[in-house]
């Protein structure tokens, strides 16, 4: 996996991304830091943990949504904005594009995310989030969220082996992994979420 990532680590404009909410717990901030550090290691980039901590010391009055990027030269860049209103429930549908469970780029959060961005830009009317499946019909990620589900035995989440990002909220909740097929989506209780928005109840619209 790392050899594939490192061979593409020099593509122009590539950056690692962490999007976090100011005021998050130290434990959650540590998860963001650890994920960016792991991504940098996979790409063969340097990572300055103290620089990460300095970069997120910003004025919350400029917005609680903080997007931190890291480039190949080790430079951090911060942008701030308002946290989007998520609403009480999200309506879910399925993307036409499929992901490959063996694609190593799905495991690191970078600006190399055109498949996700295009799907989100083309959300159908009445849909809040689009889900992806892999080549086996297993549910992976949403375009900006992790999926969580309950068949009646407690909350679970799809396994990393399906081809998805190790989300910070996912790590924080530490739900058991379980494979979920697209055919199962109408029959389970659903949530989506990320570290910025938290956990959002969801409903399958097909």
Name what the model sees in each region.
Residues 1-138, 152, 160-206:
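Conserved alpha/beta cores of soluble small-molecule-handling proteins
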Residues 141, 146-157:
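Glycine- and Gly-Pro-enriched alpha-helical subdomains that act as flexible
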